[in-house]
Amino acid sequence: TIIHLSCLVFIMGATSIPYWPNKRPFYEQPLYLFQIISPSAIKKYGIINYWIYQYVSLQPVSENSKQYIHKFMKQYYKRKKSLSNNHHNKNLILILVESLQSWAINLKIEGQEVTPYMNEIIKDSTTLYFPKIVPQVKDGRSSDAQLIINTGLLPLMTGAASSLCATNTFPSLPSALKEKGYTSISFICDNRTFWNQGHTTIAYGFNHLYDQMQKEKERKEADETLFQNALPLLKKENSPFYAQLVTLSSHEPYNTPIIVDSPLMRKKFINNEARNYLIAIQYVDRCVKHFIERLKKEGLYENSIIIITGDHEQMTFNNYEGRVQQTVEDCFVPFIIINSPLKSKNTNCYFSQVDIYTSLLDLMGCDSYFWKGLGESVFNNDVSNYATFRANVAVKGEETPDSIRNYKNECWRVSDILLRMNYFKEPH
């Protein structure tokens, strides 16, 4: 019996190595943990591996943690103020671009612009551009970005919330907009089982999910097909609506260029992967241009606020420059607001990805919604100018009080517990 038990412990230890909490440096990519639903994970990885993963990732929330959360949330509701009095019924169209990073915008390679269209629109007086958004995704990668932007929560410290918390009750942007009469729809290129989006889309309060929007096209043509197929569906949708479009074409790997006749093919680069990444971003820029031009032609543009943002870092700026050492600044993603009804004096400040949710509530006039998120609005008069990349890794302005730094870092633990205990299932 002792021998059998010892063997079992050894096997469990050996097979569980990929599932231990991520201890790697912040500049390395998090582990990709189970981006599929439970039955598929069991079939692919085996019941023992999946059980270990569940066990490690979803330890029961202790009574001390529950008391800590109740105390935190009590103070949270006292501290969070109503948002600006900004009332309108404009549509919200959010384009979540795969791996789009700020350093690629306004970049010229030997005189050749990488993103000529985005370069043009960020100069418009009705457009706001925040280039210093710190991505906060962890093991869930793209699915974590949807969680952060749509719920104002941070990811699990270990594991993908899309797999482990898909049956949770979430406060969300779609739910806030529903109170104002909005319908929320999401368009994705992948199958709905990928990152468990079929379940999380419902959990986040969306009314409809349109998946496999790339149809039978290859990845390099996915975004063009996504926008083409989404447009007639948007035309049929009654206003006001919130539409989330999740792109795919700029996904890794960057082994080969998706456009072989791109002008960037004739330019000099330190490495080919950086070149191929920028070629993919150049293609996305063109697709976004055509989509927005069609919105104008179909009469949807003027009555819509359009958001362009990246889901996470991938080809970071240091790789483009040939530097080994990576900083948080190398990982910034953009936050672009087209047709913004609000102004902001904070466009050059540091913000966290979780701040996008709070800012969108502000932008859409959801001032009465109970959950303002764990972030701060880019439209606030005073902002912290402090953003966390991973827990305890941050960028900051000249002066950051300890109270702000402590609160921002505390939010990682808070969100992890909120998710694991399904806090919002019961009214508080």
Describe these PLM feature segments:
Residues 1-90, 107-115, 119-123, 127-129, ...:
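N-terminal secretory/membrane-targeting segments
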Residues 71-428:
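Solvent-exposed soluble domains appended to multi-pass membrane proteins
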